[in-house]
């Protein structure tokens, strides 16, 4: 170590002296006042009382602690000029002079320092000792301060623990007293706990009610959804079932129609082959017939000679003359339109009736499917349709618009009818023909077997196509019911009531018997209304004025048939009339016509009613509501003859009349109308029993076998 100068040594010495004097004074003060004395701090008497306050304690006003400066500032302090007035060295009331044995080195003045600086003495270990003592002193002071703080905190914790012990002891004593007094719980606590439990229970009930309400709502929604699901499923199943049944029913109907069509086609082919053989036989007598026709059709009046070159020869040029068999007397009377090869109908179209008729085409629905038949070819709609024979042997060929198809059991099936926007009975043309033709033909007002309440039902059923005509079973004919329209009661096969009609398809509907004359009246009326329904339903259409005229001529033909049915007669060609006088003796007797019926025909007549019935409860050539079977029954069957309802096109180039084919026990006529060039013409084949009545001079009927 380098030696300190004399001045510095003196200053350090003074500082140590002052520090030691201060320490001695501090210790003396604390020993006297018993403050922070080890003897007084640790061994404290048991009766010592302190404040229970846990907060920081304030110092007593009379206890002033003097803090000494750190030894780190000794050098700075030494450079300063100490002032004796700045520090009180007294401890309490005792002056500092009584305790200080050494002078405070910090109070050394500069003069003394200057004096001592001149001292030549040197203490090399004094500085290190002073530094060590200073460090120890500071450590002791810090330890003392830490111990004092810990002591104060411990005393406070002790006081708090003692207070807690006292409170717990008091509570324990109280609980023991309650237990000794059998007071296990307080009423206030019980009430408070019960109140809490009640509140919790109410809250639980409210929550449970909310949950139950939600549960019921969910269950109700689930039930509703389940019911709706099952209902929808049931609807779908029912709809699918109905659709399946409809499809199956339609398939069955289509199969039946296909089968019936095949059978009908086979029957047509067989009959066509037979007709071809008949035509070959008819060509043999063609030359004789041409000669007879030319001779018999020459008029005797001058006017007739003027008309002959203009009308009749031209018709003979365009159409083949009627071919007659050697027995020309068997041509029966009929409407003039039944001989299209001899007569051309000319109808006026500038009358109000024609305008009313044209209104039917305008009223027909535009949505109806087009008919394959031409407008006027009404007779060609029922090709090869054969009627059942009656008990008197009067079979009739159908010229109705029914497009019949024969099923395997002999019945006829037809498609469903198409409805129109306006009923037929509301049209002006129907009201006209009802008053002019239908009512005069039927004469329901004078019918003895029909009440005035039933007359309207009969007319409505004829108009709507629901009238059913069926043969009378042979077992019922013996009772001899009178005709419901004319009241005829005469016995015999010619006047026998062979058919009956009812106004609906119901089995419980009342049946009204018909004689031969009235049967033809009903059939002609029904056929006429059936053709009007075909027009109104759109199955017969007129694209131009020519087709409208053709349809008008067809209605005239049907109205003429009603006229001849109520008259009970018809027309025949003049050559047939001339030959009828020559062969009058060979005419069949009307009253003995039943003897002319063959064994096979008699078997058919003796058959039960089911053999005559069709699926529509025994329609006799179908009075039904179908598209093609709407029309009434057909065939011209009157007392004076059976007509052949031809419809020949005015443009036909070939029209041939069938040859009469005689059977062993009956007479049947097969008629063929064929056209080669006109696309509108339709081959029409009909079969009917031909009856010819001739009276001898003595008034008796003769039979021709």
Curated annotation (Swiss-Prot):
<keyword id="KW-0653">Protein transport</keyword>
<dbReference type="GO" id="GO:0005085">
    <property type="term" value="F:guanyl-nucleotide exchange factor activity"/>
</dbReference>
<feature type="coiled-coil region">
    <location>
        <begin position="144"/>
        <end position="285"/>
    </location>
</feature>
<comment type="similarity">
    <text>Belongs to the SEC2 family.</text>
</comment>
<protein>
    <recommendedName>
        <fullName>Rab guanine nucleotide exchange factor sec2</fullName>
    </recommendedName>
</protein>
<dbReference type="Pfam" id="PF06428">
    <property type="entry name" value="Sec2p"/>
</dbReference>
<comment type="function">
    <text>Guanine nucleotide exchange factor that plays an important role in regulating the growth and virulence, probably by regulating the autophagy pathway. Affects the sensitivity to cell wall disruptors and the cell wall thickness by regulating the expression levels of the cell wall integrity (CWI) pathway genes, thus coordinating the growth and virulence. Positively regulates the autophagy pathway to enhance the expression of CWI pathway genes in the presence of autophagy inducers.</text>
</comment>
<keyword id="KW-0175">Coiled coil</keyword>
<dbReference type="GO" id="GO:0051286">
    <property type="term" value="C:cell tip"/>
</dbReference>
<keyword id="KW-0843">Virulence</keyword>
<dbReference type="InterPro" id="IPR040351">
    <property type="entry name" value="RAB3IL/RAB3IP/Sec2"/>
</dbReference>
<keyword id="KW-0813">Transport</keyword>
<keyword id="KW-0344">Guanine-nucleotide releasing factor</keyword>
<keyword id="KW-0597">Phosphoprotein</keyword>
<dbReference type="InterPro" id="IPR009449">
    <property type="entry name" value="Sec2_N"/>
</dbReference>
């Amino acid at each position: 170590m380098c030696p300190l100068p004399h001045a510095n040594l003196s200053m350090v010495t003074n500082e140590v002296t002052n520090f030691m004097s201060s320490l001695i004074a501090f210790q003396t003060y604390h020993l006297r006042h018993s403050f922070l004395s080890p003897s007084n701090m640790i061994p404290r008497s048991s009766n010592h009382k302190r404040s229970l306050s846990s907060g920081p304690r304030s110092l007593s006003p009379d206890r002033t602690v003097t803090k000494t400066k750190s030894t780190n500032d000794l050098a700075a302090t030494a450079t300063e000029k100490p002032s004796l007035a700045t520090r009180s060295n007294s401890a309490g009331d005792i002056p500092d002079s009584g305790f200080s044995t050494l002078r405070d080195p910090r109070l050394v003045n500069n003069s003394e320092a200057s004096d001592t600086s001149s001292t030549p003495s040197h203490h090399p270990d004094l500085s290190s000792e002073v530094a060590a003592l200073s460090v120890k002193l500071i450590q002791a002071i810090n330890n003392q301060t830490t111990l004092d703080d810990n002591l104060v905190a411990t005393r406070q914790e002790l006081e708090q623990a003692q207070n807690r012990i006292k409170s717990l002891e008091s509570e324990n004593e109280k609980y023991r007293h309650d237990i000794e007094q059998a007071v296990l719980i307080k009423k206030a606590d019980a009430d408070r706990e019960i109140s809490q439990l009640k509140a919790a229970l109410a809250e639980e009930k409210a929550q449970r009610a909310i949950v139950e309400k939600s549960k019921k709502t969910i269950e109700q929604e689930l039930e509703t959804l389940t019911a709706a699901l099952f209902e929808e499923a049931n609807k779908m199943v029912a709809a699918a079932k109905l659709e399946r049944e409809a499809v199956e029913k339609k398939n069955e109907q289509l199969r039946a129609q296909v089968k019936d069509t095949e059978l009908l086609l086979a029957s047509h082919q067989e009959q066509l082959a037979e007709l071809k053989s008949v035509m070959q036989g008819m060509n043999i007598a063609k030359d004789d017939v041409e000669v007879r026709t030319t001779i018999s059709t020459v008029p005797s009046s001058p006017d007739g000679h003027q008309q002959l070159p203009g009308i009749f020869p031209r018709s003979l040029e365009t159409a083949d003359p009627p071919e007659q068999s050697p027995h020309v007397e068997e041509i029966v009377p009929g409407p003039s339109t039944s001989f299209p090869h001899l007569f051309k109908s000319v109808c006026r179209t500038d009358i109000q009736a024609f305008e009313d008729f044209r209104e039917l085409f305008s009223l027909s629905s535009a949505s109806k499917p087009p008919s394959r038949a031409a407008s006027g070819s009404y007779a060609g709609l029922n090709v090869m349709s054969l009627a059942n024979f009656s008990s008197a042997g009067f079979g009739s060929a159908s010229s109705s618009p029914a497009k019949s198809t024969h099923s395997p059991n002999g019945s006829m099936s037809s498609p469903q009818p198409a409805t129109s926007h306006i009923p037929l009975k509301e049209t002006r043309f129907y009201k006209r023909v009802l008053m002019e033709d239908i009512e005069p033909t039927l004469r329901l007002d004078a019918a003895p077997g029909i009440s005035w309440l039933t007359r309207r039902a009969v007319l409505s059923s004829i108009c709507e196509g629901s009238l059913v005509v069926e043969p009378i079973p042979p077992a019922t004919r013996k009772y001899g019911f009178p005709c419901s329209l004319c009241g005829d009661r005469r016995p015999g096969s010619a006047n026998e009531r062979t058919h009956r009609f009812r106004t609906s398809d119901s089995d419980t509907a009342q049946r009204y018997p018909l004689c031969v004359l009235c049967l033809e009246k009903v059939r002609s009326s029904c056929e006429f209304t059936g053709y009007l329904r075909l027009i109104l339903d759109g199955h017969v259409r007129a694209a131009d004025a020519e087709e409208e005229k053709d349809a008008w001529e067809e209605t005239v033909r049907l109205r003429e048939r009603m006229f001849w049915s109520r008259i009970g007669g018809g027309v025949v060609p003049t050559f047939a009339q001339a030959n009828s006088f020559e062969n009058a003796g060979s005419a069949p007797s009307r009253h003995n016509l039943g003897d002319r019926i063959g064994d096979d025909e008699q078997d058919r007549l003796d058959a039960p009613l089911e053999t005559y019935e069709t699926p529509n409860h025994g329609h006799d050539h179908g009075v039904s509501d179908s598209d093609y079977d709407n029309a009434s029954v057909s065939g011209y069957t009157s007392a004076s003859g059976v007509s052949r309802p031809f419809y020949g096109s005015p443009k036909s180039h070939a029209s041939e009349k069938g040859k009469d084919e005689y059977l062993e026990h009956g007479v049947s006529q097969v008629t063929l109308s064929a056209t080669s060039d006109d696309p509108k013409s339709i081959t029409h084949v009909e079969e009917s029993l031909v009856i010819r009545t001739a009276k001898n001079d003595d008034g008796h009927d003769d039979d021709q076998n």
